[in-house]
């Protein structure tokens, strides 16, 4: 825009840039492995390092300040656990993700053991979201936001836990 162009440099036989220089002179360098996965991103703020598993999913990210984020996956490639830097450093629990038989996330458990539970119909539409506090008290029967759909799959009504109703047309 307005004549400003970024300069991109490529290595031989690489589809991705190895270096980008912005119009303001800010430089970012990228490192790749032999199969083309990005392993590092470097600029004046530091270097971010990435690690992958055998299925090419990012499993580790170390930022410019040395903090590590970890991700774990099941055999189907679904994210099962995410550890932000604080939880990983202190060896505390991270975020857990539970999936249904169609590999959709149906429950997210935070490090504080809060459940963000979602129920879906056969079409994949969300029919209810259980509030974390209500889930702790009543489990699957807890209060939350409910959704109703017409025969075409359009959300026509949202029922809130306080009794409020939102209609959609």
Placement of each model-derived feature along the sequence:
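Beta-strand elements of repeat-based all-beta scaffolds
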Residues: 1-169
């Amino acid at each position: 825009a307005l004549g400003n162009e970024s300069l991109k440099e490529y290595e031989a036989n690489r589809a991705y840039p190895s270096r980008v220089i912005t119009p303001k002179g800010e430089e970012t360098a990228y490192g790749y492995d032999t199969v083309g996965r990005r392993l590092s991103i470097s600029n004046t703020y530091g270097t971010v390092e990435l690690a992958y598993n055998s299925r090419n999913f990012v499993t580790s990210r170390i930022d410019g300040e040395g903090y590590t984020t970890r991700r774990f996956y099941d055999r189907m490639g679904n994210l099962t656990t995410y550890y932000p830097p604080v939880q990983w450093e202190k060896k505390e629990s991270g975020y857990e993700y539970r999936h249904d038989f169609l590999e959709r996330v149906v429950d997210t458990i935070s490090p504080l053991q809060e459940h963000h539970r979602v129920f879906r119909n056969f079409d994949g539409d969300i029919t209810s979201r259980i509030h974390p506090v209500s889930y702790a008290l009543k489990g699957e029967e807890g209060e939350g936001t409910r959704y109703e759909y017409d025969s075409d799959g359009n959300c026509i009504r949202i029922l809130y836990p306080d009794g409020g109703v939102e209609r959609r047309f």
